[in-house]
Structure formats: structure tokens, C-alpha cells
């Protein structure tokens, strides 16, 4: 499903297009940037993962988006909304390119998605984060999220790496 373009002070967020695939994969399959993502390392990615963007504009059940700097047009990262509980809760995913780490972009992205959700009547937001991912844990806490569940885990596809995770929740 496609989301309308969203703007923040510094960012333009829009629905992912097939042509965005290579930029997304640069983050997700990178050893450093994708370290805590479930996506496999580049050398372990299969054809389905490498071609994830084919037909993405027509997929249902979630809103995959890409993020650009409004002034420079630089690709900054990705984010997504997955409506849960009949749309009463939005689950977020996000990734920022390492060139833009520690500049407040993840916070700005999530602030805007929360604002959009509130406008649409969503009252609960969530996100799953590896316990080891210090930066993402800090972003969610800064935005008022608290740990809802701390018993989950996931395996990084194509590897034997298993991460323990927190599920964060924010109720408005």
C-alpha cells in the first residue's frame, strides 16, 4: 500500500517504489547498518530478498517508505508502518543510513509517523528492537515508548545469529 508524501522540517517521506530497491538494500544488507535487522548479510540474501521492491507499490498490509533530505534530496533511510489489531496499533520499522547517524533523523521520522497516526485515530504504537541496539533503544525511550515485552528474539536470516529483543509500546 502507498502512503501520501509526508514532510517534516528536514525530511520528505514517501512510499517505496521499485526504483528505491538498491538504496534500501544498501542499508539493510550492510554488515554495520543492517547489523540488528532480520535481513541477511548481502552474501546470504536470496533472490526474493534482493528483488523485494518488485511490485512493492501494490503490496497490501503495510506501508513501506523511504526518507530523503528535503533540501539536498539525499537518501537517508527507510521506515514502515504495519497496522496491527485491526488498525488500532501501528508497528514501526526504521533504518537510517550511517552517514546520517546521530543527527536526530530517526527521532524526526518516528515523531512524524506518530503524529500521522494520532491524526488517523491510532492510539497505540509499537516497535521491536534488538536489546543490543543501543541507539534505537535510546530513540524509542526518548519518544516516550516503554518496554512492553522483553521475552522475544529473532534470528538474522542466513546466519546463526539470534538477537534478544524488546517490544516497545507507546499509548496515547
Locations of regions flagged by a protein language model:
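Acyl-donor (CoA/ACP) binding surface of acyl/acetyltransferases
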Residues: 1-35, 66-172
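A short helix-loop-beta-strand connector motif used in the catalytic cores of GNAT acetyltransferases and
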Residues: 53-66
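Conserved GNAT-fold acetyl-CoA-binding loop/helix
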Residues: 32-54
